[in-house]
């Protein structure tokens, strides 16, 4: 006798653990690029995040009466922790990443029943909670370490994260005192300050002469565009490996680029559209966060609509909101719309009566 099983009867052969490991591997170019430009802080933040995430997930699954090792072996919690660790300032206090990781794992994932049940991206839940609750710590960024007279060593990074001082007793602001201009803000922050208030910089060309930009007349942000290109390379790798689909990142980036380009013709002073694409978390969000298979749309047309919606929200927040980046908020707002998008884009079952026909 044959045993009857439910569909699907064929599958891609990709296990969840394999997908998560491919995603982690694809993040490594950006991970090492971030170390090169911003120091060892991201290494320590990642270790703290992954350790906290594993402990939190273990306890949560144990309390639900299930076997933790069966769930931890899919590496999804490690990917969530790594995404959050790479999204926060590298030298944020240790308790920032611990709180954010606990919120991501417990409030963003386990409270809904675990992997596959959460409607919102867990890492972005943790990030947004941190950004709203601790805005100072979450917006204090060190400029690229090649601009510093004394770049922080691994020991300095450890000391800064756990005590707020380097091994020589210097604070983060004291390390950057020799750099002119805005030193503890991202280039997107600097541009936002510029076009909202002309009292800080006389004209846009003075802005892009700041050391945090390339200093050659372009508005590409030093360190940031290299990290975004690394995320782009990793994202293309995931598409070629068929770990993610192309529709979401392409729709997101094209929508944002078109809106940003159109805005440039209105005289609304801001960074160029191309510079916007390689600033902040744009490529990170497009290829590694918005493409989360659990919280994104599942239909081909729905993926395009979802990606375009994320791009629209990023544009609205960056150009007209109070936050300089907006990728995290854009993804969470778009996650809300996923059930509606899937409802209207799901293909009809063969033989199902269409509207107006009996």
Swiss-Prot record:
Subcellular localization, as worded in the UniProt entry: Cell inner membrane
Q: What is its main location?
A: membrane
Bilayer-crossing residues are 24-44, 79-99, 125-145, 220-240, 248-268, 271-291, 297-317, 321-341
| Coiled-coil portions | none
Q: How does it sit in the membrane?
A: Multi-pass membrane protein
Q: Which UniProt keywords apply?
A: Cell inner membrane, Cell membrane, Electron transport, Flavoprotein, FMN, Membrane, Phosphoprotein, Translocase, Transmembrane, Transmembrane helix, Transport
Cellular component annotations (GO), alphabetically ordered: plasma membrane
| HAMAP family named in the record | RsxD_RnfD
PANTHER family for the chain: ELECTRON TRANSPORT COMPLEX PROTEIN RNFD, ION-TRANSLOCATING OXIDOREDUCTASE COMPLEX SUBUNIT D
General function of this protein? Part of a membrane-bound complex that couples electron transfer with translocation of ions across the membrane.
NCBIfam families in alphabetical order: PRK00816.1, rnfD
Q: Per its record, how is this protein called by name? A: Ion-translocating oxidoreductase complex subunit D
């Amino acid at each position: 006798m044959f045993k009857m099983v439910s569909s699907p009867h064929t599958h891609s052969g990709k296990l969840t653990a394999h997908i998560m490991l491919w995603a982690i591997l694809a993040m490594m170019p950006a991970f090492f690029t971030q170390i090169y430009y911003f120091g060892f802080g991201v290494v320590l933040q990642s270790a703290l995040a992954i350790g906290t995430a594993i402990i939190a997930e273990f306890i949560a699954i144990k309390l639900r009466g299930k076997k933790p090792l069966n769930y931890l072996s899919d590496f999804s919690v490690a990917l969530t922790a790594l995404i959050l660790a790479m999204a926060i300032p590298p030298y944020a206090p240790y308790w920032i990443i611990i709180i954010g990781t606990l919120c991501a794992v417990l409030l963003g994932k386990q409270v809904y029943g675990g992997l596959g049940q959460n409607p919102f991206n867990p890492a972005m839940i943790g990030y947004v909670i941190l950004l709203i609750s601790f805005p100072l710590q979450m917006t204090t960024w060190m400029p690229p370490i090649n601009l510093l007279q004394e770049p922080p060593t691994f020991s300095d990074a450890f000391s800064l994260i756990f005590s707020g001082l380097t091994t020589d007793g210097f604070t983060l602001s004291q390390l950057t005192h020799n750099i002119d201009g805005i030193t503890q803000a991202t280039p997107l922050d600097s541009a936002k300050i510029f076009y909202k208030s002309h009292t800080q910089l006389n004209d846009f060309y003075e802005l892009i002469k700041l050391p945090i930009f390339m200093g050659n007349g372009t508005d590409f942000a030093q360190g940031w565009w290299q990290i975004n290109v690394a995320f782009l390379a990793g994202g293309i790798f995931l598409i070629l490996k068929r770990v993610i689909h192309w529709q979401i990142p392409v729709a997101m980036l094209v929508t944002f680029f078109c809106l940003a380009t159109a805005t440039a013709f209105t005289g609304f002073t801001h960074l160029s559209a191309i510079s916007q694409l390689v600033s902040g978390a744009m490529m990170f969000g497009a290829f590694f966060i918005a493409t989360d298979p659990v919280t994104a749309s599942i239909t081909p047309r729905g993926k395009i609509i979802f990606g375009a919606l994320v791009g629209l929200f990023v544009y609205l927040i960056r150009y007209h909101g109070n936050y300089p980046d907006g990728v995290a908020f854009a993804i969470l707002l778009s996650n809300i719309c996923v059930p509606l998008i899937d409802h209207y884009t799901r293909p009809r079952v063969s033989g199902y009566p269409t509207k107006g026909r009996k």
